[in-house]
Amino acid sequence: FFSSILDGIEQTANEAGYNILICQTGEDVQKEIRSVQTLIGSRVAGMLVGVSKQTAQLHHLQEVLDNSIPLVLYDRPCPSLPCDQVVSDDYMGAFNAVEYLIQTGKRKVMFMSSSFQLEVSRRRYQGWRDALMRYHIPIHDNMIVECDTRSGAIIATPRILQSEDRPEAIFCVNDDCAAG
C-alpha cells in the first residue's frame, strides 16, 4: 500500500522540482514525533504524513502547521487538524464489501478489526454493521474479533473456522488481518 503511494508522491514531487525525504516509523508514534521534529528543523517545504495507529495526541502535527509548513495527511483521518487529508471512504468501502457478500448469499459475516481507537476501524465497523442491519441480519458479540496483525490473524482464524458457529465470510479491517 505505502510503496504505491510513495511512487506517486516521488513522481509528482520530481516533476515539480522537489526531492523527497522519507521517514519510516513502523507504526511507532515516538519515531513519528521525532521524524516530524527533524523535518521541521530541516525546514522542509511541506509534509505528507500517514499517522501511526497509536497516534492519539496531535501536538507534533499542530507544530508543523504552527511553523507554516504545508501539511497533508493520508490514510488515517485526523478530523481535528485543519489541513488537507487524503483518505478512503472507509464507511462506504466496508458497506459495499459486506453488502456484496450478503448479496452472494453470505449471512454470517464476521468483522475482524484492529483497535476501535482508530477512526478507520470505527468507520469500517459502522459500514459493516449498517450493511448487516439493512438486510435485517442480527449482530452478535461473537461476530466481532479484535485483531490487527498478521500474526494475530494466523492464530485467530483457525479457531474461528473450527468453531461450531463459524462465519461464512470474514470482513477484515486491514490487509495484515486478511493476510493472516
Regions inferred by a protein language model and the residue ranges of each:
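Short beta->alpha connector loops
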Residues: G26-V29, S52-A56, D176
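Structural motif
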Residues: G50-S52, S115
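Bacterial carbohydrate/catabolite-sensing allosteric modules
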Residues: G8-L21, R34-R43, L58, L65-G180
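A short glycine-rich beta-strand->turn/loop micro-motif centered on a GG-aromatic cluster
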Residues: I22-G26, G50, Y74
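Intrinsically disordered, low-complexity polar regions and short flexible loop motifs
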Residues: M47
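Extracytoplasmic "Venus flytrap"
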Residues: F1-S3
